[in-house]
Amino acid sequence: MSGEKTDCQKFFEANAENNQRCKALQDFPSEVQIAWESQSASEVSPGVVTDNEQLCRHWTNPIHYDDATGTLKLTAFDDAAGIGLSVNRMAHTTLAAVGQFASARVLGWNAEHGYMPQRSLVGYSLFDAKEARQVLTNDAPARRAFGVYDTAKVPNETTGQEGDTSHADVCQLIAGPQAARSLRHRMRDLLAPRLTPFSNGDSPEASSA
C-alpha cells in the first residue's frame, strides 16, 4: 500500500492504542462504517478483505471456552465491540502459522502469569468474511451489524508487536448493550459449531499435550 492515507487508515492508526476502537467506530454513520471496508486500514495491508475470503479465529481456554458446556462462551465475542475480534486471512497465511502463533501466545502468557489459572489452546473456527457482513440487526430497518477491516499489523520494536499482514478485525457496528448481546449470540451460533482442534502439525502446544 502506498500514497495518501485513507480515512479508514487514519482512524485505525489514531485508535491503535484504544482498546475500545470498535466503540469509537460505532459513532460513525453506517454508510461510513461500510465504506471503510473498501479502504485499506494499514500501511502494510495486502488489500481490503473481500466477501469470499476465508477467515480464521483461534480460541483459548478458559478465556473463550466453557468446559462445563463444551462450547464457546458468549463473552468470547466481546472483543468485537471493543478492541476488535482478531482474525487471520487465510489467503495470506496458513493454518500451521496461525496455530504456531496462537500456541506461542498461550505459552508466553502462561510463563508470565504462573500464579494465575493457565490457558490452553482449544482450536479455531473458519468462516467467510461475507458471513459476518451478512448478519443484520433485528429492528427495522435492518442494517449491517458487523464490519471486517484489513488491520494488518506493522512490526513495533517498542511494544514487541510482530508484523502480521494476515491480520484483520471484525467490529460490531451497532451500539447498545441489548443489541450487543443479541449480536454476540448470532456470531456464536455461526462459529461455535465450526470449532475445530488444531492438529499436531498446526500447533506446538497440541503436539506436546
Functional labels for PLM-detected ranges:
Residues 2-53, 74-85, 91-209:
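Conserved NAD+-utilizing ADP-ribose enzyme module
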